[in-house]
Regions:
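Helical mechanochemical/support elements of P-loop NTPase systems and associated helical scaffolds
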Residues: 5, 9, 29, 41, ...
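C-terminal accessory "lid"/substrate-recognition subdomains
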Residues: 155, 164-325, 329, 339-355
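Phosphate/Mg2+-binding loops and adjacent switch elements
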Residues: 83-197, 202
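A secondary-structure boundary/capping signal
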Residues: 9, 36, 132, 159-160, ...
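Nucleotide-state-sensitive switch-loop elements of NTP-binding domains
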Residues: 2-139
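Short, hinge-like loop/turn segments at secondary-structure boundaries
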Residues: 51-54, 146, 202-205
Length: 355
């Protein structure tokens, strides 16, 4: 039996992974795609945003990150899909794993090589990293996770290039190529990337990954944890992407920056659209730089459909989504991910916007 091609879709918070995946799920490409996706936070919003009648299999694992704390769940999810496929219970051609925006893709990729059952059924096709052209420069400077995602990519897709000028795009491309000269770069504005830029790339080269991280195949527990650290280096540095034995900081895996946290707002009451717009506008003015990612499904007064709400830093938008299901209670569910955000200010303000 042929191995099932698998793609890891990664990128920092708000880069546009779900938008891209949604387009892939809607595109008439004749493929059946099993999706494994998860988000950082208590609530999973993406299963509300992703197309719900597309026929693809979506497995939610939102009790931790695929990259580490639910590694076992990822293995079980892949093996369970393979068993159900072999038994004829489900049908799919390939797998896409959408990681949380704070994930290091290295341990996710490692899963395909350290578990015999996974290796017997799946082939890791490529790691595709979506990069937000509007915010990437700041993210690459502030967050090591963003550098790791670029460093491990087999293909880089630039999103939101319409929000910056050509000079900024060129500068970002140059920086990305310094971090990862192996990965070709394409664009994916509004998720509009050709399917050929995402699937069947045959881009994953184990030897390249071992050059970047000689400990890539070392199983957790053999020596601390994973050692995958992609970093930028200046011209005076004698190596590309992996620290030598004399580097000055430790290699123990940090789950995520301790000052980054997620919180959830839920209510079955509808929002007053005008009050909510004013409050959210004031939030992004004051806390925008700290608001790494926020999204949700909203119940709005006078609107009989879901309203899908998303934002990154000061850039915020919403769209009218599908109708509420027959047996579904209309309710708002919002997730905010940020650095040192005052949860009580957000929650109190949102409550005051309810009808």
């Amino acid at each position: 039996m042929d191995l099932i091609p698998s793609t890891i879709l990664t990128g920092f918070l708000g880069a546009g992974k779900t938008t891209l995946l949604n387009r892939i799920l809607q595109e008439d490409h004749g493929m059946r795609i099993a999706v494994i996706e998860n988000e950082f936070g208590e609530e999973n919003i993406d299963n509300e945003i992703l197309v719900q009648d597309s026929g693809e299999q979506i497995i939610e694992m939102n009790n931790g990150c695929i990259c580490c704390t639910v590694r076992g769940d990822l293995i079980e999810a892949l093996n369970s899909l393979a068993r159900k496929r072999a038994a004829g219970e489900i049908s799919f051609d390939r797998v896409v794993i959408e990681t949380t925006g704070l994930a290091n893709p290295g341990p996710v990729a490692q899963t395909f090589f350290v578990d015999e059952e996974v290796g017997a059924h799946y082939l890791l096709d490529a790691v595709v990293t979506v990069v937000d052209a509007r915010h990437a420069m700041e993210q690459l400077t502030a967050h090591e996770e963003a550098q790791r995602q670029v460093g491990f990519a087999d293909k880089i897709l630039l999103s939101k290039t319409d929000l910056v000028d050509a000079a900024a795009v060129d500068a970002l491309k140059a920086r990305l190529q310094r971090i990862n000269p192996r990965a070709p770069i394409a664009t994916s504005d509004f998720g509009r990337a050709p399917i050929a830029d995402v699937l069947d790339l045959r881009g994953f080269n184990l030897n390249d990954k071992l050059d970047i991280d000689p400990d890539f195949l070392r199983v957790d527990g053999e020596d601390g944890h994973d050692h995958d650290h992609q970093h930028e280096h200046g011209a005076d540095c004698g190596h590309d992407h992996v620290h030598d034995a004399s580097c000055s900081h430790d290699h123990h895996h940090s789950h995520h920056s301790d000052d980054i946290a997620a919180f959830v707002f839920k209510s079955e009451r509808a929002f007053d659209p005008e009050r909510l717009e004013q409050f959210l506008g004031s939030l992004v003015q004051v806390f925008g730089p700290q608001m790494l990612r926020y999204k949700g499904v909203l119940r709005m007064d006078g609107v009989d459909r879901k309203v899908v709400f998303q934002g990154v830093h000061q850039i915020m938008g919403s769209d009218v989504g599908p109708k509420w299901g027959e047996n579904e209670t209309p309710a708002t569910k919002m997730v905010f991910i940020g650095k040192n955000l005052p949860k009580d200010v957000f929650i109190r303000g949102l409550e005051q916007c309810l009808v």
